[in-house]
Amino acid sequence: MNKKEKEIIKIILRAYDHHLIDQSAKKIIDILTKTGANIEGPIPLPTRKEVFTVLRSPFVNKDSREQFERRTHKRLIQIINPNKKTIESLMHISLPPAIDILLKKNQ
């Protein structure tokens, strides 16, 4: 038997603010459902946590340190068998500049 291969477009969203990334994912899903696309997601991916340790004093007191952290939140949206209208609507989506978007196509 010859199975029909699925064409999948993956949209990966990255941001430091989880509220902003959830709003953007909802906006993308609303636009794509209007085109009749088959969508999976938003799927939360692991959050990357970076910790930076800095000395508080410029000269002495090595025991006195300050720690900062930066969390990068990620969401995955999959579009299964997209049509031309779906791809065109993806090109015209406007999102905040704080959102990083990565598109991948798998077959």
UniProtKB/Swiss-Prot annotation:
InterPro entries, per the entry: Ribosomal_uS10 (IPR001848), Ribosomal_uS10_dom (IPR027486), Ribosomal_uS10_dom_sf (IPR036838)
UniProt-recorded name of the protein: Small ribosomal subunit protein uS10
This protein's encoding gene: rpsJ
Matches recorded under HAMAP family: Ribosomal_uS10 (MF_00508)
Biological process (GO), any one: translation
GO MF: structural constituent of ribosome; tRNA binding
Alphabetical list of SUPFAM superfamilies matching this protein: Ribosomal protein S10 (SSF54999)
Organism domain of life: Bacteria
Any single GO CC term annotated in Swiss-Prot or TrEMBL for this entry: ribosome
Alphabetically ordered keywords of this record: Ribonucleoprotein, Ribosomal protein
Protein family per UniProt: Belongs to the universal ribosomal protein uS10 family.
UniProt-listed Pfam families: Ribosomal_S10
Protein's job: Involved in the binding of tRNA to the ribosomes.
Assembly information from the UniProt record: Part of the 30S ribosomal subunit.
